[in-house]
């Protein structure tokens, strides 16, 4: 069964209390999680100043420094496929796109909604394209599709050749559109990248030049924000509960990615105001047999089989919490897209039990209230009964508190989790990469200006997930949930290896493994991926662990 949160005796220590001794000189960890950028979307043309080896579009010959197609551009070609009977994670290929369709606007700020984006050519070469050849670096772009079953299809067994086709045939889900004829307004959004060699993302480049960059870090769950933030908090996933036991969600909230009759890959039930649960232990459930078959064919054992509890309906996309940010219960029901309160153990409870201080600082909080800058699915601890039903909810604080705590390091917790306000998160359509850089520059600058704090701190800079952007990196499938696409991670610290690119395979649960190693904690639950071993290097491929499944603990980013 899913492990319920156990009674914890010393759960409520003050957020600024002295932490027990650490195993490294790092006494403060600040984890900053923006949104929705793949590694190649950001670092496509980055060349390490140190001369380190790096896997990106430039090093692979996919593009040139000027962003134009490189000698091996054709190996990224996007293909056309067919799924007319039941969902497949490796659909039957019909052919190859000649040219890619014009990207759509989706809901980008300041642009007409859900139309072709006239700033881009009507047709694009079949492969990655430089966004800033067509628009300014600070301009918003449309939002690529990034959902669970869609990403499994897009990855296509590691070939990564169905990103555009899935975006065009299923999009964000059938409940978000009336019928296939209404279109998805995605086009080739997923294939866009920024060009560091031409001056894009200057602050990310500065951080990578001076600190430690991972080029093998991944989102832990296929798909979008909500499930990936839950993996950061729990090392696993959350499921539907009723009256203290696993239950069955309303029928209209269960995902069904099987195609509707007479359509090609138009999901039967899918969408943000619709299907988001999957009973992933049961191969008779829609979409699950294909994932189980893929796991069974892996050349190594997956973690805990599917790592799905029998009878559990897991939340694999975005729903809001069964609690309001104040701690009050929220209304639930078939047309209220919230998951009931959760008993899944979190890193916050484990830290409190150990007597280690922590806080979560979500952008858009305003005391106990919230503003339009608040992202409810980016705030995973408000889903937890153990947090929201007691004094630990007081550790969820706004960003005025964050900057006050940085200035007065006596109040700075040992472990801090930070999510930017929506407009500074980097999320396509609602923010920009440049706005996320501004937030990071301000935050890291504040930490560095407090010398006593900076000398014993590490700041991990990452994003929740890839946002549906294409990426050339290898993906290690661990269980039915993922991993998913490669994403950026930079360790900013006096102890970081300077200008080094680390190839150790990691995902967001590696952040938990680092915390557990540094503050002497045990794995969170029977199914949490923090049980996985540290990778053993394969001499023939630095990016693929020889002892799969395995994920690192981020210690290789530092020198102590």
Language model features with spans:
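N-terminal signal peptide c-region/cleavage motif recognized by signal peptidases
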Residues: 12-14
